[in-house]
């Protein structure tokens, strides 16, 4: 269990509670979670973070009415900056988007501006929003993470409790390598409901070579770990930086969707550019 799982801030969330669905616009449905909840225990300070990055959200269930009452549908792309005070709690985001369903907007840009304003207010930070018509995305290929997949290892695992022990002495030799490693075995659980969160992760680094077996065991140890997606990515970045001490490091996870939303956080201390094409499980 995370050290802050019972924090009073989390007690006020709608997540894990029975809620009514509203179909007329209501910005108050959005709820933020302070990033400091998991950053403080990791020793990460807002004014001296070892990374940059964004939380990339894809909105698959977004609909509203135009000025004449005709329903509109779109796919939304949201990027929430790592410097924001809060992350956006996903169930509240879903409830908020549902409140657009029977609300009239004059045009698409009004919808985009409304989303950007409300999300920025909730996150207390920079947020960008783009809306796409369905025909703009039709035929878009399924993407994949570039890199070497480390999943096909003939190893025995019988412990699924989170630990950083596997990263102790996880680098070898003095030779500096630059490589990208990929795993599709990342599974953590919602901090509140403990529902499973399934993801693929890409780790790009420059430094002493990381032992792939130890890295895979470390990633598998998240299987019983309860944290939000964004928090897991920052924990992984921080642990790799601490134990493996790479010169450059980027960590990018793309999670499967729930409630019409997928969350894809990345953190980097280099010039990393994330691919935003959905993966096969998304």
Curated annotation (Swiss-Prot):
Disulfide feature: none
Record keyword NADP present: yes
Residues given in the record as substrate binding sites: 88-90, 229-230
Residues the record lists as binding NADPH: 90-91, 258-259
Gene Ontology MF terms: preQ1 synthase activity
Locations listed in the record: Cytoplasm
Keywords from the named record: Cytoplasm, NADP, Oxidoreductase, Queuosine biosynthesis
Top enzyme category: oxidoreductase
UniProt KW NADP keyword: yes
Gene3D superfamilies in the record: 3.30.1130.10
Secretion signal span: none
Subunit structure: Homodimer.
Main function: Catalyzes the NADPH-dependent reduction of 7-cyano-7-deazaguanine (preQ0) to 7-aminomethyl-7-deazaguanine (preQ1).
HAMAP family: QueF_type2
UniProt-recorded name of the protein: NADPH-dependent 7-cyano-7-deazaguanine reductase
Organism for this UniProt entry: Escherichia coli O17:K52:H18 (strain UMN026 / ExPEC)
């Amino acid at each position: 269990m995370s050290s802050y799982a019972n924090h009073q801030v989390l007690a006020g969330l709608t997540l894990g509670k029975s809620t009514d669905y509203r179909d007329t616009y209501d910005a108050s449905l959005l709820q933020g979670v302070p990033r400091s909840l998991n950053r403080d225990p990791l020793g990460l300070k807002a004014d001296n973070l070892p990374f940059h990055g964004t939380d990339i959200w894809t909105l698959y269930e977004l609909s509203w009415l135009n000025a004449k009452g005709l329903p509109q549908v779109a796919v939304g792309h949201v990027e929430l900056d790592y410097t924001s005070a809060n992350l956006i709690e996903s169930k509240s985001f879903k409830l908020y988007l549902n409140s657009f369903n029977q609300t009239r907007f004059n045009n698409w840009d009004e919808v985009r501006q409304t989303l950007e304003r409300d999300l920025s207010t909730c996150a207390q930070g920079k947020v960008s929003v783009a809306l796409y018509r369905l025909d703009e995305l039709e035929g878009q290929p399924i993407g994949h993470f570039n890199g070497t997949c480390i999943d096909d290892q003939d190893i025995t695992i019988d412990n699924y409790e989170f630990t950083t022990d596997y990263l102790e002495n996880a680098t070898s030799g003095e030779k500096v390598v630059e490589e990208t490693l990929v795993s599709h075995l990342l599974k953590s659980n919602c901090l509140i409901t403990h529902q499973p969160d399934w993801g693929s992760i890409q780790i790009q680094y420059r430094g002493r070579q990381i032992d792939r077996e130890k890295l895979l065991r470390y990633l598998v140890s998240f299987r019983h770990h309860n944290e939000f997606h964004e928090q897991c990515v920052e924990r992984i970045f921080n642990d790799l930086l601490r134990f493996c001490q790479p010169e450059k490091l980027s960590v990018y996870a793309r999670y499967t969707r729930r409630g019409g939303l997928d969350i894809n956080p990345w953190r980097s201390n280099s010039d990393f550019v994330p691919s935003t094409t959905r993966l096969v499980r998304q």
